[in-house]
């Protein structure tokens, strides 16, 4: 991954790099890989995340349609 540093503004370049890493999901991946996760735990976590996403989408749909 590459970030341009303009006018020796390192703080702005670091901010841009952090935003790119966040968008790519690198921090989340690092957090998940910090410890071994059993396959059964992984399936349970992914199922719970799917349920959470479905509920969130349903809430947004209801809010948008006004039901």
From Swiss-Prot:
Q: Which GO terms describe its molecular function?
A: structural constituent of ribosome
Similarity annotation: Belongs to the bacterial ribosomal protein bS21 family.
One Gene Ontology BP term is:
translation
Record NCBIfam families: S21p
InterPro entries recorded: Ribosomal_bS21, Ribosomal_bS21_CS, Ribosomal_bS21_sf
A single GO cellular-component term on record: ribosome
Q: Which PANTHER family match?
A: MITOCHONDRIAL 28S RIBOSOMAL PROTEIN S21 (PTHR21109), SMALL RIBOSOMAL SUBUNIT PROTEIN BS21M (PTHR21109:SF0)
Q: Which domain of life is it from?
A: Bacteria
The gene that this protein is the product of is: rpsU
Q: Looking at the keywords, is Nucleotide-binding present?
A: no
Q: Does the keyword Ligase feature in the UniProt annotation?
A: no
Any idea what this protein is called?
A: Small ribosomal subunit protein bS21
Keywords annotated in UniProt: Ribonucleoprotein, Ribosomal protein
């Amino acid at each position: 991954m590459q970030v341009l540093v303009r006018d020796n503004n390192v703080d702005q370049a670091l901010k841009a790099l952090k935003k790119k890493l966040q968008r790519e999901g690198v921090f989340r991946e690092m957090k998940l890989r910090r410890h071994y996760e059993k396959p059964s735990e992984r399936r349970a976590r992914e199922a719970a995340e799917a349920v959470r996403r479905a509920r969130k989408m349903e809430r947004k749909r209801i809010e948008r349609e006004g039901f």
